[in-house]
Amino acid sequence: MEHKKEKVGTGRFTHLILKNSRIFVGINFDQDKDFQSALCDPDYETFLLYPGDDALEIENGFAERRPSRPLQIIVIDGTWPCAKKMMKLTTTLHETPRLSFTPGKTSEFKIKHQPMEGCLSTVESIYQVIRGLNAAGIEKTGAKEENLMEVFRKTVEQQIECAKEPGDGYRKKPFSLPEERKTSKKWSKRLLFFRGL
């Protein structure tokens, strides 16, 4: 699920790399017949990659669950505020079982400011899920998921180089690395925004 503002986000090239993936663009998918058909496909066991108290953690007991059908994982591609809105408006997702993981590292998306520690880009999240499914013995990709991170890292490097170039860019301030940035005070007021439904 890609927010319409994220057409150049990491979800787009992740979709181009991953086989058997589909992309749906919008905000509210309740009336999207193709999306609803995929969501309710009886041939798959469907999970939504989204945090929550009732989310199953890949690292904690998911292997024992052993899905009887092939897995289908829905991923929301957008900023955290956009993801929240998409989740709220698409009511058919509210009863979809959730899947989550424990971030094992800081995001490598240096060009973009992450709101909180542990927040990852779409491609990094999908990479973590694939690795977790491999570790659980549910998937056997032969480390092909490393291609995702290779493309991602090269993209980030290129974006950083472009950001450093002087000229009429969209940035109001010079580019700085994540460790040099100050966290906005606004984020502390938005914690419920991320942790709620």
Question: What are the functions of these language-model segments?
Answer:
Residues 4, 8, 43, 77-80, ...:
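Alpha-helix initiation and capping sites
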Residues 8, 32-35, 59, 107-112:
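Short, charged, surface-exposed secondary-structure boundary motifs
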Residues 19-88, 92:
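S-adenosyl-L-methionine/SAH cofactor-binding core of RNA-modifying enzymes
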Residues 2-3, 28-29, 54, 101-106:
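Short, acidic/turn-prone active-site loops that include or flank metal/cofactor-
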Residues 72, 80-197:
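C-terminal folded domains that constitute the principal catalytic or ligand-binding module
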